Design a protein with these regions (language model features):
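Conserved small-residue-rich beta-alpha loop and adjacent elements
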Residues: 85-146
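N-terminal Rossmann-like NAD(P)+-binding subdomain of aldehyde/semialdehyde dehydrogenases
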Residues: 1-102
Length: 146
């Protein structure tokens, strides 16, 4: 049993180290670079062919929901989320109150941990991912145990 726990801890430590390394690559990105990256993330799952493949895989793997619902979530929710946040400032000075001599700076936090629910594993990881990357963070998404 303790070997299983040790192996799990080592596995998680490796994931976190790899995620930190990935985050370091984007922590100095400009707003334009961040926005291009999250656009690419959404396109990678919502593009023709891939959205269908993910929807079918989700149905086969979870035996929950229906294909059309999964496909539409990938197509609509990922794009809608992108449109909701694409114009938000997330790099550098994001708010300024000169009369009080206050500036609010956006700064990456690092590695974020998240769960993907078994009922919505097709859109949730990319939506959580674009929110994390918008702040120049990395994310590890784990499936919810079923």
């Amino acid at each position: 049993m303790s070997q299983d726990i040790g192996a799990a801890k080592a596995f998680i430590a490796d994931l976190v180290a790899r995620s930190r390394a990935a985050q370091k690559q984007i922590e100095h990105y400009s707003q334009e670079q961040v926005d291009a990256l999250i656009r690419a993330m959404v396109w990678s799952v919502a593009r023709p062919g891939m959205a269908e493949e993910i929807a079918q895989f989700t149905i086969d793997e979870t035996e929950l929901g229906n294909y059309d619902g999964k496909f539409l979530k990938i197509q609509r929710k990922t794009r809608a989320t992108l449109l909701d946040i694409i114009h938000d400032k997330s790099v550098g000075i994001i708010e300024e109150y000169p009369e009080r001599n206050i500036r609010i700076l956006a700064k990456p936090l690092g590695v974020i941990g998240a769960l993907a629910p078994s009922t919505n594993p097709e859109a949730t990881p990319v939506i959580k991912g674009i929110h994390a990357v918008k702040g120049r963070n990395s994310i590890i998404v784990a499936p919810h145990p079923r």
